[in-house]
Amino acid sequence: ISKEWAQSMIDDWGRDNDWVRVNVLGLFPRAGEDKLLGPGDVMLAEQRDAPRAAFVEEAIVWGLDVARFGSDASVLRKRQGPIAFRGYTFRNLDGVKLANRVSLIIQRDMLDGARRPDALVVDQTGVGASAFDHLKLLGWGDVIIGCDFGESADDAERFADKRAEMWWRMAKWTKTVGCLPSNSAVLGGELCAPTFKFAKRGKHTAFVLESKDDMKARGVGSPDDADALAMTFYSDLWMRRNYVPEHAAGAATRHVTDA
């Protein structure tokens, strides 16, 4: 491996990270680790909070993960800088009905004082294609971005696909400045669920996130809520870099609801 790649791994995860210890430093792990996030990371993120001044000028990004199968849920998540806001879960809706519900929720958010979103990232595979098209017809065409989890990452040398890249960014955010809802049991469990590995891609070693299908094969449910939050990291331009969070109880307004 190159010195540049090794240093980037140390910079991202620190020398105490078990994966770095084994694969970069050649040391024994302190504990088995093939997960991006652990329960401790989630707990700390749930305990953080941020004053309004820390996020009010940050980009408002919504992520919509669209259900693929009957047992899956469609989930809408909003993030603004270090804050992950309330989430909405939908079941048994076709693309048009889902788009209508999403549009109403965002409009209601704006009526409550929020700015128009800077981006609405929508899973446009399968049923998602219908929701994506209808959201454009409903007037969100200037902010909507279609996402295919299998598309090429911005940094294709380091990440196997876009989903892996978004989860990597989300994990860094969670470990550093991210403020998760204090009652996010479902989201927290999903954030800790997928495994990862590193695989050779030509001359480079790429980060590979466990697929939803592989998770289901080992009896783990689809991380729909976590995927929705990950989609708010579609672009690294929306990641807050300079904010140092205060440790406090999670804000009551950042809760998960079913819609």
Give the residues covered by each predicted segment.
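Short beta-strand scaffold segments in enzyme catalytic cores
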Residues: S74-K78, L229
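Charge-patterned, long linear interaction tracts outside catalytic cores
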Residues: G63, A185-H247
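Mg2+-dependent endonuclease catalytic cores in nucleic-acid-processing enzymes, primarily RNase H-like
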Residues: R77-F207, E246-A259
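A residue-level signal for conserved active-site and pocket-lining positions in enzyme catalytic cores
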Residues: V24, M170, A228
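ATPase catalytic-site recognition across NTP-hydrolyzing enzymes
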Residues: I1-L64, K78, K200-H204
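A general structural motif
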Residues: V66-F69, G95
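Short, flexible loop/turn elements at secondary-structure junctions
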Residues: F28, R68, Q124-G126
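Short, flexible loop/turn motifs enriched in small residues
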Residues: E57, R68-V75
